[in-house]
Amino acid sequence: MSVLKTDYVDDVINKELAADRKFGEVQNEDGTKSYNDVTPYTQEGDEYGAEQINFENKHTNYAIEAADRTYEGRDLTVEFAEEIAGFSDPWRWIKTRLAAHNIDGLHVEDYIPIYMGNYLIKMQIAGINTYTRCCDQEVGWHIDWISKDCYPDTVQWFTSNDNNGTSADPYPYNKSTVKSFLAGLEAKLPAEVRAVISSKRFLLEQRYSASGKLNDSTSWGWQDLGKLWIPCEYEVFGSLIWATKPWGEGQAVQYPIFANSWKNRIKGAGDGGSRANWWLLSVCAGHSTYACIVYGNGGASSYSCSDALWVPVCFRITE
């Protein structure tokens, strides 16, 4: 992001000619005369015009709105239409920007609209380099995108109403119906999106015992969430509320898009739809049949795994 300039300068008189001011005489129609200063002037410092000043002012306006939590995000395909025109599609432009470590003008809550079948999905920037240098496999420059509203169709967290893992795979999320559902949605993404997204690496909670169903998670391990995923409870709320401490946290951090405001935690059932209850990947502490959710009013809660709720569309693009 640009650092706002503080060295703007006005036109000044050439120092060598400062003592030799020159004026031109102009005869006016009413018989009077006017005198124009024709002394040579030069620019000292950078030549900053309206284009550059307006660009910097956008950064200033963003900083004010972001601090006040009033920023609504911009459609990047409109804001950067001229720049994007040099690429095959907006997502290739994003990928190229990341490869060049150039995120100038990109902000949390800015979005790019896509269609998944007939469904309009507005993909918002949830965080920029939120996990850079993190994880067992070091993460480089990246942007994580989370849809402004949920995908219109609902899904059960797990059809068997069970939040435990298995002997072969102790991670509850890996066996979940919701993960399989998201994997199926990948084919509905535009081809240009599928071409640039990467799997998200995550320190995922484990919950399994051969002696019987567990009510709490007992460990964690690094796993690939897939190319489409949903956030954990900590990534939304910045703390563990219903998930098991500390295993439900992993190495998570709250996404900037969810910080200090309910605004982006509240999602519609489809673009602009009514408030939706939506699934998180975390399973609930103290129960063997509940998973964590974001309630329609933005609060943290938990629902039975066999309930059918909504999910946002989430993906990562790396450098």
Task: List the predicted regions and their residue ranges.
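Extracellular "spike/adhesin" assembly and maturation modules
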Residues: M1-E65
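Collagenous Gly-X-Y triple-helix signature in extracellular proteins
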Residues: R69-E319
